Amino acid sequence: MRDEVIRYLACPYCGGGLARDGGSLRCGTGHAFDVARQGYVSLLPGGAKGGGGDTAAMVRARDDFLAAGHFASLAADLARTAAAVAASPAVPGCVLDVGAGTGYYLAAVLGRLPGRVGLALDISKPAVRRAARAHQRIGAVAGDAWRRLPVADSAAILALNVFAPRNGAELRRVLSPAGRLLVVMPERDHLLELTGPLGLLSVDPRKDERLSARLSPYFGLAGRSEHRAALSLDHRAVGAFAAMGPAAWHTDPAALTARIRRLPDPVAVTLAVTVAVFQPLAGDRAPAGPATSSRPAPPARTAAG
């Protein structure tokens, strides 16, 4: 865990800053958190459940799928957008990815922002274990997006939210007034050639309404663009895609394999997402006290990417 990242963290119990103390991080009131040998630190408060986070098998599938480059054009587009809207390097702040998964998208963004460090936050310990080695300037933390984030007020100059939960109040609290929030969300036809035949979760038709409800009290839309690409996925890639999302929980593996075999090999697939840029609204930030939100019923991360 880099010291340049630790400065942006906050104790999940008292909200105080953290400092290195041997192999642990410790706040001024004595709460201590061990840094795992893989380089990440868990800042999930005692008793917090990790339900909904990716399992180790799901993380391996996601890593395989993304490492093959299927969504490389999206990662590059997101990185270009981040570089275009980021404040001057003279303005302090980290790049925070809430629901970072393996750290794939955060690593791409840091590649375009050489003066910044990144903070990957995810409820899944297997995910942050992988994110900790996604880029040399990433620090990885296990944390819950629906609780108070273990991040200092105004710590982030950029916040990323890629196919992940959105806690508007907390995103506003941790984002600098000069910062920007980048949200990636699927369009109705995103990977439609797979979701239907494989019986996977489809895109919520009310996604724009839900996004507005979560963010409009705290952020204003500064811009949006659509990213589309034609993909060709062989059956191995399709299997990895299915295994990295909620299908891994509720779909019979034998039935899923049979459905994949009925697809063309390779199969033509449409990548269709919106990249939206939000700026913090002027005025008071969200209150500094514990910020929680009821966890929605669906899993925290979809198979969108």
Where are these regions (language model features)?
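A short acidic, Gly/Pro-enriched loop at the edge of an enzyme's catalytic core
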Residues: R147-L158
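A short glycine-rich, Lys/Arg-flanked "PGG" loop and its adjoining helix->strand segment in the class I
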Residues: G168-L182
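Conserved class I S-adenosyl-L-methionine
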Residues: R180-S212
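Conserved Class I S-adenosyl-L-methionine
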Residues: I6-R7, S225-G305
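Class I SAM-dependent methyltransferase SAM/SAH-binding core
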Residues: C94-D97, G101-R148
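N-terminal auxiliary segments of SAM/dcSAM-dependent transferases
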Residues: M1-G52
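Short alpha-helix
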Residues: D204-Y218, G245-P253
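Class I SAM-dependent methyltransferase Rossmann-like catalytic core
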Residues: G51-D77
